[in-house]
């Protein structure tokens, strides 16, 4: 559509065929009477966030809001920066809401979501808090949905009136298994990487190779590059 041309023309790169098709799938779904329920699956670096941005822009052009929930603050911040870069040049205001923000920062963001100042919210579990309200939430995007509980996903969806749902996953799942895990979702697969994007290599090692893995990371740090270590969140239990 003419409205989406503004989005495509503003991108600093050309979408892959798979990305273009996935966005068109989302738009077609959202134009139907029943809400969209779609899974976008693709390797790390395949451009799933660009697809989410396209869907969010379509929702914005129709006067509504979108929310993207990520399982960690690191991922939420990455999505926020990416979506902000894609959408704010088009006048779409994007907000970040995470648990580590100050009470004042959270208050300002929540006020902006409730009065419609922000069209897109990106965050962690902070999005599902009772004090987080939206003016007109029409699209809920979940990154790695299996990392969230049923109640958390339902809580976010309940902040809109039967909103459209888009799930993003980098986990390579066979189609039949995806239907078992995610339910009755339509599926879009990103089959190629954007031009110039290097494939991301993933390795799994046992505890016996931990020191070797750390040395591997240190080699890149010594070259001036960056890295991070993510661990499962645990509650500290103090002896009584």
Predicted regions mapped to residue ranges:
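N-terminal low-complexity segments that are often proline-rich with Ser/Thr-Pro
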Residues: 238-240
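Serine-centered coil/turn micro-motif
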Residues: 1-2, 236
